[in-house]
Design a protein with these regions (language model features):
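Small/aliphatic-rich secondary-structure junction motif
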Residues: 2-61
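Short beta->alpha connector loops
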Residues: 11-14, 98-102, 123-124
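Short, solvent-exposed amphipathic alpha-helices that sit
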Residues: 21, 72-81, 104
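Structural alpha-beta junctions
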Residues: 28-31, 88-91, 141-150
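General small-molecule cofactor/ligand-binding pocket signal
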Residues: 33-35, 93-97, 150-152
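A short acidic, glycine-rich active-site loop
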Residues: 56-74
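Structural beta-alpha unit
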Residues: 83-116, 156-158
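Gly/Ser-rich helix-loop-strand patches that form or flank binding pockets
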Residues: 107-158
Length: 158
């Protein structure tokens, strides 16, 4: 059984931003699973009234929400990461998630084959934005750099 590295992505996360962290912890023979929320490009609504245009827009929306289209978009989203990690012997997969990302990560962790979870630290992003705004006013001060990524041991979740 291959050791898995889970990378749950939120709506606005870029896989390329997490690539250096995954490269650092992954070893050849491991498998990285990028968990992308469904729908990949966010929600869309129809703005047309009842008419022929509304029917045409409904068809476009139906094709926009198809699972295959979103899976293709998710694969295109992480294509640069796949290329970089495949060169190092790390297998990469896409898991398109329609439900709770937290529950999906917990389900993977319960199975026992997850080695590590790489995710963005929400509080880290907030602190980094705060320090960026303060540092713009006080450029002469040296500010500490916080890592905005957390590495989580899955045994702490179960």
């Amino acid at each position: 059984m291959k050791k898995l590295i889970l990378v749950p992505l939120k709506r606005n996360d870029r896989a390329e931003d997490l690539l250096p962290y995954v490269e650092e912890v992954a070893r050849p023979g491991m498998k990285a699973i990028f968990m992308v929320p469904y729908p990949v490009d966010g929600l869309r609504w129809s703005h047309e009234e009842i008419s022929r245009k509304a029917i045409e827009e409904g068809k476009r929306l139906a094709s926009y929400y198809t699972w295959d289209t979103n899976l293709r978009k998710a694969r295109e989203l992480i294509a640069p990461v796949v290329k970089a990690l495949s060169a190092k012997g790390i297998e990469v997969a896409v898991d398109l998630r329609a439900g709770s990302m937290r529950r999906a990560v917990r389900d993977y962790a319960v199975k026992g084959d997850v080695h590590l979870i790489v995710t963005r630290a929400s509080i880290g992003n907030w602190i980094e934005r705060l320090l960026d705004s303060v540092a713009s006013a006080f450029r002469s001060l040296i500010r500490p750099r916080f890592s905005s990524v957390m590495l989580i041991n899955p045994r702490t979740l179960a």
